[in-house]
UniProtKB/Swiss-Prot annotation:
Protein name from the UniProt record: UPF0735 ACT domain-containing protein Csac_0995
Family stated for the protein in its record: Belongs to the UPF0735 family.
Pfam families for the chain: ACT
CDD domains: ACT_PheB-BS
Domain ACT: start-end pairs: 72-147
InterPro entries: ACT-like_dom_sf, ACT_dom, UPF0735_ACT_dom-cont
Length: 150
């Protein structure tokens, strides 16, 4: 669970100590029901129970932490008819609640759009949503601008 008074960082997986990655893997095994107990999970991933309990509430995948939040997406799109509609349909199909849409006037065939969505009822992960939007022809760039609790 996120602590309101803590400082958080987004860190690339490749620079994390191995113990953190193993804690994440153990948590995934437990969440997916692939193991029934912490003892079994830590044994499979090769860490001690004390390491698991020390870090389990301090490390989690970024997209997992976006569940139940409001996220703001920034997109750079080609100026082609229907592209924004396709993106909004993809978001809607995940059961996300679209809160705001801001689109700038296209310049040089490119338009920038920001979309804020509530993620609590989504049927897909934020990562899957972003990957699906990236596959739309004409999407040049998509990134998460911000995230906040509600």
């Amino acid at each position: 669970m996120l602590k309101k008074d803590a400082t958080y960082y987004i860190v690339e997986e490749s620079v994390l100590p191995e113990v953190f990655l193993k804690v994440i893997k153990a948590k995934e095994l437990l969440e997916k029901g692939e193991v029934k107990a912490v003892n079994e999970a830590v044994r499979l991933v090769g860490i001690s129970r004390s390491a698991f309990y020390k870090y389990k509430d301090c490390i989690f995948p970024f997209f997992e932490s976006s569940r139940g939040k409001i996220i703001t997406l920034a997109l750079v799109l080609q100026d082609v008819p229907g592209i924004l509609s396709k993106i909004l349909n993809i978001i809607s199909d995940t059961n996300a609640n679209i809160l705001t849409i801001n689109q700038n006037i296209p310049l040089g065939g490119i338009a920038t759009v920001t979309i804020s969505i509530r993620t609590s009822d989504m049927t897909k992960s934020v990562k899957e949503l972003i990957q699906e939007i990236e596959r739309v022809d004409g999407v040049k760039k998509i990134e998460i601008l911000g995230r906040e609790e509600y």
